A protein has these predicted regions:
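Structured catalytic/nucleic-acid-binding cores of DNA maintenance enzymes
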Residues: 1-273
Length: 273
C-alpha cells in the first residue's frame, strides 16, 4: 500500500499534470469505488469544475476543485495517469476524468480497493474518512512529551500504535519498520514504556526517514509508480523491511521476521531492544 512518501509524490505529480484542467465529463466503470455521494450526483457535480490543486492528508489525496474536494485513497494498487482520450483504456481502469482539452486523468486499480469521496470544500475534514485521522507525522505538535502522553493511554506495542491512523496518519508497514530500526526500538516494545529520550529519537527518525523517502520518490516494493509513471528509489535505502534472512547492515546479525499487530514485521534483534 502506498504510504505517506508515495502519496506525497503522487500529489506532486498530479499538481504538475492536471492543475488548472477543467473536467468535461466523468466516466465510472466500477461504481464501488465511489463511496459518497451517489454515483449520478458524483458525476454531475464534478462536471464543469476546474482542478485547483492537490494536497495530501495521511495516505489520502485531496483534489481541490472550484466547489468540492475529491478525497481519494489508493489503497493497495491504485494509480493515476494522464492519457489522451483516444488512447486505449486498460482493463483495470475504473474512473476516467475527461478534461476540456481532450486529455483524461485515469484511475487504475488492479485490486479495486481504492475509494473516492466528494465533499464541499471545508466539509471534507469533518466527514469520514478524513475525520478519523490523527496527526500528520511532520506536525510540530508531535513532540516527545506529546508522544509520551499519547502513548501512555495504550497497552499496545509501539508498532501497533504507529500503524494506528487515528493517532498518526500516513505511516504503514514499510516506514514503521524502518523508523523503529533507526531508533533502536524493538517493534514489540510497549509504547507506554518508552522513555522521553527514546521517543525523541523516534520522532526525529520518523521525520528524517519520511522526508528522505519523499525526496527519493518513495519506495517501489512491488508496483508503485507516481502519476508520471516513475518508480521510487528509497527501497534501495531500506535497512530491514523485506530483508528477512539478510545480514543487518549495522551489526551483521540476520534480519528476523515476526508478526506484530497482524502485520509481517522485520527487525534486528541485536540493534533493537
Amino acid at each position: 500500500m502506498p504510504e505517506l512518501p508515495e502519496v506525497e509524490n503522487v500529489k506532486n505529480t498530479l499538481n504538475r499534470l492536471v492543475g488548472g484542467k477543467t473536467i468535461k465529463e466523468v466516466n465510472v466503470l466500477w461504481s464501488n469505488i465511489i463511496k459518497h455521494p451517489e454515483l449520478d450526483e458524483f458525476k454531475i457535480r464534478l462536471s464543469g469544475q476546474t482542478i485547483q490543486h492537490v494536497e495530501r492528508r495521511g495516505k489520502f489525496l485531496k483534489i481541490f476543485l472550484d466547489d468540492d474536494v475529491l478525497v481519494s485513497h489508493l489503497r493497495m494498487e491504485g494509480k493515476y495517469a494522464l492519457n489522451q482520450k483516444e488512447e486505449p483504456i486498460d482493463k483495470h481502469t475504473h474512473v476516467l476524468f475527461e478534461f476540456t482539452d481532450g486529455s483524461e486523468l485515469r484511475y487504475r486499480d488492479v485490486r479495486k480497493f481504492g475509494t473516492m469521496h466528494l465533499y464541499p470544500i471545508g466539509e471534507e475534514e469533518q466527514q469520514p474518512p478524513l475525520s478519523k485521522l490523527g496527526y500528520e507525522p511532520f506536525s510540530a505538535e508531535l513532540t516527545p512529551a506529546f508522544l509520551k502522553k499519547m502513548f501512555s493511554k495504550t497497552g499496545r506495542s509501539v508498532k501497533a500504535v504507529l500503524l494506528d491512523q487515528s493517532l498518526i496518519a500516513g505511516l504503514g508497514n514499510i516506514y514503521v519498520d524502518e523508523i523503529l530500526f533507526a531508533s533502536g526500538i524493538h517493534p514489540e516494545q510497549k509504547a507506554s514504556g518508552l522513555s522521553l529520550h527514546r521517543l525523541k529519537r523516534l520522532q526525529e527518525n520518523m521525520v528524517s526517514i519520511l522526508k528522505e523517502s519523499v525526496e527519493k520518490g518513495g519506495s517501489t516494493i512491488r508496483s508503485y509508480v507516481n502519476s508520471e509513471g516513475r518508480s521510487g528509489n528509497f527501497q534501495l535505502e531500506l535497512f530491514v523491511y523485506g530483508k528477512k534472512g539478510e545480514p543487518c547492515k549495522k551489526c551483521g546479525r540476520e534480519i528476523a521476521r515476526i508478526v506484530v499487530a497482524g502485520r509481517g514485521t522485520h527487525f534486528c534483534s541485536s540493534c533493537q531492544k
